[in-house]
C-alpha cells in the first residue's frame, strides 16, 4: 500500500489519515449504511468475523481489499471482536453530505476496547469487566483496575511478581496495559487483550496531575493513596487510557481506593482453581461455590457476590454486621417481599455509567425510571429492623423528583435508539408537540389531495406515496399515464407505473420534511438535556446502586441460608477451626444420596491432621469443605454445618491435584513442587493449608521423604492449621514424634470382594488403603487383582518383621524393602508345560502312521 496520500483518492486519503492515528486497532469507517474496513484491517476482520473479503476499485494504482458490516447490526460484530480481545475505533460521518466539497468530514467518536466497553450488548452481565494497568519499580509491583461500567477504581501494591500473578488470576481483567520495559511479561502469557504502552504514561508526576484533574482535587491525600507511588503510576496509565478511548468526560470516576492485603484473606491462583470458587476445573461455571451461592436477582448483586467470594475480608465488625442483616431478614421474613422489588431495580450500576458517558439509550432511561420507582418500597421493607440495615437503607436515598422527570419525559415503551425519534413523551415540550402535530397532519392532507386529484384527472389508479430517495410523488399506472395533466412533472419511471410531482405537493413536502427534521433535532436536543438534569445527582445514585447491590447479596445469602439449612458461624481471635457436622456446599447439592457431615477440630495444640483412607473415600471433599466453610464465614455468609467457630486466618493454601503444564514445559511433579514451595515460604501460623497426596510424581522413597519433610516443616516451623492427606502410611507415626499432630481417617468397610465407603471421618489412622478393592471397582481385570494380592501378601509378610522396630501398624516402607530378596511370585500368564509344548509341536498332516503312534505314546508318558 502506497503511503504517499497525494497518490490516493480523496476518500482513501482521508481513511489513511484516520488509520494512521489508530494504527494498532481495527477502524470501522462509516460509509452510508455500512462500516467499512480496508487493506489489512479488512483481511483481519474477514477472518475474525467470517465475513466476505472483497475489493473496492483501486487507489494509488493498487486494488483495495475491503470488508464491511451493516451499521444497524454492528453491535453483534463488536461483541465478537471484543470477546476475542480486539479493539475497534468507530469513525462516523459528522459533516453534511449536501454541503461537503469532497469527502464528507469524518472523525473517530469512540474506541471500543475489551476493558472499557460499556454497551450492554457487549458486556458479560454477571461478571466484572475490568481494564488493568500493571507496573514495577525497584522490586515493587502494582496493579490499578478500573471498571468503566461502575466507576470503581482500585490500586494495590504487591511484594513480588507471584503476588501480581495471583491478583491477575483473581481479577481476570478483560484488558491489561503494561509498560514497554515491564520486566515480568511472562506472567501475561495466558491473557487476551494485552496492550504495550509507552513508559511516559506511567510517570508519577503525570499520573498525579491527571488524577487530581479527574477528581477535581489539589491533592490525593484525602483518598489515602499518596504514599502508594508505584500504584499511582499504574493508575495514571489506566485513567489516561480510559480518557483516550472514551473521548468524553468520565464524571462517574470520582474516587480511588487503595486495597491493602492486610484487609483480606489471601488466596493464590492454585487455591482459587482447586476450590472451584467461580470456575470449575474444566473452565465452566457449573458446580462451583458461586453457582450454589449466587441466586442474586440483580446482575450487579451477582457481580458483588463474586468479588466477596474472591476476596474474603478479615474485618470482624463488618462481618458481624453482614451476619446481623442476614439473620434479621430471615427472622423478620423480609426475603420474599424484598427480592421481587430488587429484581425490578435491574442493573442500575451499569445504566448509571452509560448516563455518565452520555451513551445511555432510551430503554436504559426507562429501566432507570423503573429502578427509582422501587426505592420507596425497598426502604419500607428494610428499615427499622437493625442499625446495620438502617445504615444501608439510608444510603439508598430518595430520587422521587428524578423518577417524576423520567416519567414525564420518556414514553412507556420507547424504541431502542433515539436516532429516529419517537422517544420523548407527548406534553413534555410544547414546541416538540407543535412540530409533531404538523408532521402527523400530513396523513389527512395527503388523503384529501389524492381524492381531489383522482376526481380532477379521472384516473382511478392515481395514488400518492413517499420514499426516502424521491420524497412525495403521484403514481399513475402505465396504462393511464397518457391521461396525466401537463402540469404533472415526471419524477421517476417504473416498469408498470410513472411517478410525478406537482408544485402543491412539492411545497407541502418541504414543509413536512422541515417539520420532521425540526422535530427529530429538537427531540435529540431534549434527550441530551435529560443527561444534564440527571448528572447533578449521579454520585448519589451511584451510592444507591452500591447499597442496592449489597442488599441484594445479603438478601440472597439469607435465602440460601434458609433454603440450604446453613447456620451462623462464630469467630474467635484465637487460631483454630472447630466445625461440627460440616458439609461441602457444592457436593451436597449434586449428590442424590444424603451428604455425610463431618467434624474438624484444629487449634494451637492440634494444628496438623494427617488424613488417611481409601481413594474415593472422600479425603479431598473433606479438606475442600473445611476451606470453603471457612471462606464462606469470612464473606459474611452462613455455612453448611451444625455449628462452626472459625479463628483468625490470613491465607488459605491448597495443594490438591496437579497436571503437566505443557505451555511452560513443567511436569506434574514440577508443578506440584512449585506449589508446595510457595506454601512452605508463605504460610504462617494463621494460614489454613490443605495438602493432598504430595510426592506422587517421583519414586516411592523420594516421594515419601519429601512428604515427611513437608509435613514436619508445617508442624514444627510454620505451625499452620494443616490437613495433610496421604497414602504414605509411614506418616501416621508423626503424632508420636511431633507435638500438635494427630491422625484422622475416612472410614470404609470391606465385604468379600466389595468395598463400601462410609465417608465419615474418624480419629486415628486408617487400617489399610483398600487400593485393590477400589481397583476392582474400576474394572481392573481379575487376574491383575489376583497378582496384586499375591504381591501385597508378600509385602505385608515383610512388613511384620519391621513392625516392632518402627512401631507402625502398617509397617515401614522405608526399611521393608531391604530385609530380603523378593521371592518368585506366580506370573500373571503361566508358563507352558512340557506336555503343552509337545502337543503344540505336533503337525498331524506331516506324520506317518508310525510317527503318530510314537507321538501318542510320548504325550501319554508326559501326562503321567
From Swiss-Prot:
InterPro entries noted in UniProt: DNA_mismatch_repair_MutS, DNA_mismatch_repair_MutS-lik_N, DNA_mismatch_repair_MutS/MSH, DNA_mismatch_repair_MutS_C, DNA_mismatch_repair_MutS_clamp, DNA_mismatch_repair_MutS_core, DNA_mismatch_repair_MutS_N, DNA_mismatch_repair_MutS_sf
Keyword vocabulary terms for this entry: ATP-binding, DNA damage, DNA repair, DNA-binding, Nucleotide-binding
GO terms of molecular function: ATP binding; ATP-dependent DNA damage sensor activity; damaged DNA binding; mismatched DNA binding
SUPFAM superfamilies: DNA repair protein MutS, domain I, DNA repair protein MutS, domain II, DNA repair protein MutS, domain III, P-loop containing nucleoside triphosphate hydrolases
Keyword Nucleotide-binding: yes
Top-level taxon: Bacteria
CDD domains: ABC_MutS1
Gene Ontology CC: cytosol
Binding positions for ATP per the UniProt entry: 613-620
Gene Ontology process terms (BP): mismatch repair
UniProt-listed HAMAP family: MutS
Family: Belongs to the DNA mismatch repair MutS family.
Functional note: This protein is involved in the repair of mismatches in DNA. It is possible that it carries out the mismatch recognition step. This protein has a weak ATPase activity.
Protein name: DNA mismatch repair protein MutS
Taxonomic lineage from the root: Bacteria, Pseudomonadati, Pseudomonadota, Gammaproteobacteria, Pasteurellales
Gene expressing this chain: mutS
Amino acid at each position: 500500500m502506497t503511503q504517499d496520500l497525494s497518490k490516493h483518492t480523496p476518500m482513501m486519503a482521508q481513511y489513511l489519515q484516520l488509520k494512521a492515528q489508530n494504527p494498532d486497532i481495527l477502524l470501522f469507517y462509516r460509509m452510508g449504511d455500512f462500516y467499512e474496513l480496508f487493506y489489512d484491517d479488512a483481511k483481519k476482520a474477514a477472518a475474525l468475523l467470517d465475513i466476505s473479503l472483497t475489493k473496492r476499485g483501486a487507489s494509488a494504482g493498487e486494488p483495495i481489499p475491503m470488508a464491511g458490516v451493516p451499521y444497524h447490526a454492528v453491535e453483534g460484530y463488536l461483541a465478537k471482536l471484543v470477546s476475542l480481545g480486539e479493539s475497534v475505533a468507530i469513525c462516523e460521518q459528522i459533516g453534511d453530505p449536501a454541503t461537503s466539497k469532497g469527502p464528507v468530514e469524518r472523525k473517530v467518536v469512540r474506541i471500543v476496547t475489551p476493558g472499557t466497553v460499556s454497551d450492554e450488548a457487549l458486556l458479560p452481565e454477571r461478571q466484572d469487566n475490568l481494564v488493568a494497568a500493571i507496573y514495577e519499580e525497584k522490586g515493587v509491583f502494582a496493579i490499578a483496575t478500573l471498571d468503566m461500567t461502575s466507576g470503581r477504581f482500585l490500586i494495590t501494591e504487591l511484594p513480588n511478581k507471584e503476588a501480581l500473578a495471583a491478583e491477575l488470576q483473581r481479577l481476570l481483567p478483560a484488558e491489561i496495559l503494561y509498560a514497554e520495559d515491564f520486566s515480568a511479561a511472562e506472567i501475561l502469557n495466558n491473557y487476551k487483550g494485552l496492550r504495550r504502552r509507552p513508559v511516559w504514561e506511567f510517570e508519577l508526576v503525570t499520573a498525579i496531575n491527571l488524577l487530581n484533574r479527574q477528581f477535581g482535587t489539589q491533592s490525593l491525600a484525602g483518598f489515602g493513596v499518596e504514599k502508594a507511588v508505584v500504584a499511582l503510576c499504574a493508575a495514571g496509565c489506566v485513567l489516561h487510557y480510559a480518557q483516550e478511548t472514551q473521548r468524553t468526560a468520565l464524571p462517574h470516576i470520582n474516587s480511588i481506593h487503595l486495597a491493602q492485603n492486610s484487609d483480606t484473606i489471601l488466596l493464590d491462583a492454585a487455591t482459587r482453581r482447586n476450590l472451584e470458587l467461580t470456575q470449575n476445573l474444566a473452565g465452566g461455571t457449573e458446580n462451583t461455590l458461586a453457582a450454589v451461592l449466587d441466586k442474586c436477582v440483580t446482575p450487579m448483586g451477582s457481580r458483588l457476590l463474586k468479588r466477596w467470594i474472591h476476596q474474603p475480608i478479615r474485618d470482624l465488625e463488618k462481618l458481624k454486621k453482614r451476619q446481623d442483616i442476614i439473620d434479621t431478614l430471615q427472622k423478620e421474613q423480609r426475603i420474599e417481599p424484598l427480592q421481587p422489588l430488587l429484581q425490578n431495580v435491574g442493573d442500575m450500576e451499569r445504566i448509571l455509567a452509560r448516563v455518565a458517558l452520555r451513551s445511555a439509550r432510551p430503554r436504559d432511561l426507562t429501566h432507570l425510571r423503573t429502578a427509582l420507582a422501587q426505592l420507596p418500597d425497598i426502604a419500607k421493607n428494610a428499615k427499622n429492623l437493625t442499625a446495620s440495615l438502617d445504615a444501608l437503607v439510608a444510603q439508598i436515598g430518595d430520587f422521587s423528583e428524578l423518577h417524576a422527570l423520567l416519567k414525564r419525559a420518556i414514553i412507556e415503551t420507547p424504541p431502542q435508539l433515539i436516532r429516529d425519534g419517537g422517544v420523548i413523551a407527548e406534553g413534555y415540550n410544547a414546541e416538540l408537540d407543535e412540530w409533531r402535530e404538523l408532521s402527523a397532519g400530513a396523513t389527512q392532507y395527503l388523503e384529501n389531495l389524492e381524492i381531489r386529484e383522482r376526481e380532477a384527472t379521472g384516473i382511478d389508479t392515481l395514488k400518492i406515496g413517499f420514499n426516502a430517495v424521491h420524497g412525495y410523488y403521484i403514481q399513475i399506472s402505465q396504462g393511464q399515464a397518457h391521461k396525466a395533466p401537463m402540469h404533472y412533472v415526471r419524477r421517476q419511471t417504473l416498469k408498470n407505473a410513472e411517478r410525478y410531482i406537482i408544485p402543491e405537493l412539492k411545497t407541502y413536502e418541504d414543509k413536512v420534511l422541515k417539520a420532521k427534521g425540526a422535530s427529530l433535532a429538537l427531540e435529540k436536543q431534549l434527550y441530551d438535556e435529560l443527561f444534564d438534569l440527571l448528572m447533578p445527582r449521579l454520585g448519589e445514585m451511584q451510592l444507591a446502586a452500591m447499597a442496592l447491590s449489597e442488599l441484594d447479596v445479603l438478601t440472597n445469602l439469607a435465602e440460601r441460608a434458609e433454603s440450604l439449612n446453613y447456620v451462623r458461624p462464630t469467630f474467635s481471635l484465637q487460631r483454630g477451626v472447630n466445625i461440627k457436622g460440616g458439609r461441602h456446599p457444592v457436593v451436597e447439592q449434586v449428590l442424590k444420596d444424603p451428604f455425610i457431615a463431618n467434624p474438624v477440630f484444629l487449634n494451637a495444640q492440634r494444628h496438623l491432621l494427617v488424613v488417611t483412607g481409601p481413594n474415593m473415600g472422600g479425603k479431598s471433599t473433606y479438606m475442600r469443605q473445611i476451606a470453603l466453610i471457612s471462606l464462606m464465614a469470612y464473606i459474611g455468609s452462613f455455612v453448611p454445618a451444625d455449628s462452626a467457630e472459625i479463628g483468625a486466618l490470613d491465607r488459605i493454601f491448597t495443594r490438591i491435584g496437579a497436571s503437566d503444564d505443557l505451555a511452560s514445559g513443567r511436569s506434574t511433579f514440577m508443578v506440584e513442587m512449585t506449589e508446595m514451595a510457595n506454601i512452605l515460604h508463605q504460610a504462617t501460623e494463621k494460614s489454613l493449608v490443605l495438602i493432598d497426596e504430595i510426592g506422587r510424581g517421583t519414586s516411592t522413597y523420594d516421594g515419601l521423604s519429601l512428604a515427611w519433610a513437608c509435613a514436619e516443616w508445617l508442624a514444627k516451623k510454620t505451625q499452620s492449621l494443616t490437613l495433610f492427606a496421604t497414602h504414605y502410611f509411614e506418616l501416621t507415626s508423626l503424632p508420636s514424634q511431633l507435638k500438635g499432630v494427630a491422625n484422622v481417617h475416612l472410614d470404609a468397610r470391606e465385604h468379600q470382594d466389595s468395598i463400601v465407603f462410609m465417608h465419615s471421618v474418624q480419629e486415628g489412622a486408617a487400617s489399610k488403603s483398600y487400593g485393590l478393592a477400589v481397583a476392582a471397582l474400576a474394572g481392573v481385570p481379575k487376574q491383575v487383582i489376583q497378582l496384586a494380592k499375591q504381591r501385597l501378601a508378600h509385602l505385608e509378610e515383610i512388613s511384620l518383621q519391621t513392625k516392632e522396630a518402627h512401631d507402625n501398624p502398617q509397617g515401614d516402607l522405608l526399611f521393608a524393602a531391604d530385609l530380603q530378596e523378593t521371592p518368585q511370585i506366580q506370573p500373571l500368564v503361566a508358563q507352558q508345560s512340557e506336555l503343552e509344548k509337545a502337543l503344540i509341536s505336533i503337525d498331524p498332516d506331516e506324520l506317518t502312521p508310525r510317527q503318530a503312534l510314537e507321538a501318542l505314546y510320548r504325550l501319554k508318558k508326559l501326562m503321567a
